[in-house]
């Protein structure tokens, strides 16, 4: 995978598996130039651009904006495609984008059940085209019915899925209150997410955003064992919308990418395992597709 053109020649590769064009902050939309600078600041050498469609366009850029950025910065970005599964043209939109260079489907963040007929159409396309699918799980809001997601994994063993967001990471604990988007305190062993990662070779975990950061910081003792168990299934990603790598433009005042990389480095002293999570696992999912 080609590095950012202005990264240090000897820089260790870091793949950010979750970024967006025109990402809305608390004050403005981030420009392409700000995104590129943000990634360089965090040492990222390649990024996966996840498109939005439908309601998501109020927060981030569409398929066309991702394609344009990939074209304008060769070697620095690859892109996934998005479409609203409720629209009759969804599969055609996705298929067309894949034929024009998209190498995955996502971010899929829509108010449908994860096992709905609309989503099955998308999974079948992913199976047909051999591309991964990234899903945002949020209780009673997006890709609902997480407890039934196991049946999807069974039905599409050749499709690589990537789980993301609050209900995905909250379910590392067996005692999750599903209404609690960012649970704190000790994790109770036996959570559904932990088991799915253990039992199914076709599911991976996207460590991005506040939900991913919370998952690896709320209970450091659990997190150490969790990362050790799933070191070949976890993918570093940021989903960070700050303007400058220092928290600019955000209500929280910090950069998720910077903070999550630091937390991961603290939890993973083994350099080989760290490299696996920040580059190799994600690169393996993109293998054969990334330019």
Residue map of PLM features:
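Distinct, well-ordered alpha-helical segments
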Residues: 59-67, 89-96, 115-122, 142-156, ...
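Active-site mouth loops of central-metabolism enzymes
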Residues: 17-29, 78-88, 111-112, 179
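Residue-level marker for buried hydrophobic side chains located in beta-strands
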Residues: 13-15, 133, 161, 236
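An N-terminally biased module of ancient metal coordination in phosphate/nucleic-acid-related enzymes
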Residues: 1-64
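Active-site gating/metal-coordination segments in enzymes
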Residues: 46, 54, 60-147, 204, ...
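Helix C-cap/helix->beta junction micro-motif
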Residues: 73, 128-129, 156-157, 199-200, ...
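Histidine-centered divalent metal-coordination motifs
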Residues: 18-22, 136, 164-165
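H/E-rich (His + Asp/Glu) clusters that bind or coordinate divalent metals
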Residues: 5, 169-171, 175-291
């Amino acid at each position: 995978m080609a590095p950012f053109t202005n990264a240090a020649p000897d820089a260790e590769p870091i793949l950010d598996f979750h970024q967006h064009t025109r990402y809305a902050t608390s004050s403005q939309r981030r420009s392409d130039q700000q995104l590129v600078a943000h990634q360089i600041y965090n040492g990222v050498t390649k990024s996966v651009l996840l498109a939005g469609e439908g309601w998501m366009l109020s927060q981030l850029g569409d398929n066309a904006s991702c394609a344009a950025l990939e074209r304008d910065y060769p070697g620095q970005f690859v892109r996934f495609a998005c479409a609203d599964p409720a629209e009759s043209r969804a599969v055609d939109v996705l298929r067309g984008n894949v034929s024009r260079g998209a190498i995955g489907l996502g971010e899929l963040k829509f108010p449908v059940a994860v096992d709905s007929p609309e989503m099955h159409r998308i999974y079948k396309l992913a199976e047909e085209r051999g591309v991964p699918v990234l899903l945002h799980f949020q209780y009673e809001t997006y890709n609902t019915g997480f407890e039934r997601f196991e049946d999807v994994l069974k039905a599409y063993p050749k499709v690589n899925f990537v789980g993301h967001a609050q209900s995905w990471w909250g379910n590392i604990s067996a005692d999750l209150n599903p209404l609690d988007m960012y649970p704190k305190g000790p994790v109770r062993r036996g959570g559904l997410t932990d088991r799915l990662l253990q039992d199914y070779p076709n599911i991976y975990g996207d460590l991005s955003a506040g939900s991913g950061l919370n998952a690896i910081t709320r209970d450091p003792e659990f997190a150490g064992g969790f990362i050790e168990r799933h070191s070949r299934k976890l993918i570093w990603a940021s989903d960070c919308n700050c303007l400058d790598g220092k928290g600019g433009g955000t209500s929280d005042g910090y950069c998720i990418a910077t903070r999550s990389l630091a937390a991961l480095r603290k939890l993973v002293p083994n350099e080989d395992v760290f490299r696996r999570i920040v580059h190799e696992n994600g690169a393996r999912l993109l293998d054969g597709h990334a330019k």
